[in-house]
Amino acid sequence: MSLLFTVYEEVGHGGSVVPADTQDMISVDMGCVGADLGCTERMVSICAKDSGGPYNYDIVSELAACAKANGLDYAIDVYPHYGSDVEATLTAGFDIRHGLIGPGVYASHNYERSHMDGVRNTFELLRAYVAQ
């Protein structure tokens, strides 16, 4: 297992290079909160699709099943105006399963607000998923 920390999703190249043996990649970013979305600041968001297209169905399903099995507060949402570092990985030609999770965050960039429960649910989902 590799842990990669990137901070370049805003410019589109954060995940453009990953170890050659990478099979799965889960990006941890922010989940959106707002009208027509299921996520709140207290939840972990599991993104099914964003501006780059759908995330891997099996990964999304596995994350949702893991969240449910561990009693975590979660929502599955679609973010049409959002992108993550996983997009750069796919654009670079890596054929991997990919997913995106994150704590629900109200607003972004200039004023981001979340709740410790959202951060906890995100951490617990990641921990449980990696441990299985």
Residue map of PLM features:
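Active-site-adjacent substrate-binding region
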Residues: 44-132
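Acidic/histidine-rich catalytic neighborhood of metal-dependent amide-processing enzymes
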Residues: 1-50, 86
